[in-house]
């Protein structure tokens, strides 16, 4: 099991030229955290928050993207959401590994997903050691 950790002072950047999403954060969000759209608090002004695979609130596992900037509550969060987006953040990932939503983190071990938590694939590591966005919300629990 290896949870993705962003090196200190890392400034992730996209190696692809796809559009990025941007929306107001409803809570603090860190770089490379999976996010979901919270429209229950204020349906007229939905915000993004850190996703979670906990089955108690299914909507929190409906991942829409991976944060590429830090955001405080009320500030803008920029995120990658297009399948195939390549994020280089200066970390060392294992080529070929798949990455999953485990609680509110990104982890490369499917076995780390707790029984009855939602199964969400977030991406994989390409041959250059970069994170590639490939979000698949399976809509089922483990």
Language-model segments: residues:
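Glycine-anchored, exposed beta-strand/edge motif detector
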Residues: 2-142
């Amino acid at each position: 099991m290896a949870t993705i950790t962003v090196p200190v002072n890392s400034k992730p950047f996209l190696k692809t030229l796809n559009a990025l999403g941007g929306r107001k954060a409803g809570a603090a969000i860190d770089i490379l955290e999976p996010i979901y759209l919270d429209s229950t608090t204020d349906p007229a002004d939905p915000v993004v928050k850190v996703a979670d695979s906990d089955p108690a609130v299914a909507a929190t596992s409906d991942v829409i993207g991976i944060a590429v900037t830090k955001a405080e509550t009320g500030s803008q969060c920029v995120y990658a959401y297009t399948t195939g987006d390549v994020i280089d953040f200066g970390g060392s990932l294992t080529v070929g590994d798949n990455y999953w939503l485990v609680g509110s983190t990104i982890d490369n071990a499917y076995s780390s997903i707790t029984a009855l938590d939602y199964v969400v694939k977030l991406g994989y590591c390409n041959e250059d050691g970069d994170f590639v966005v490939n979000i698949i919300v399976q809509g089922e629990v483990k």
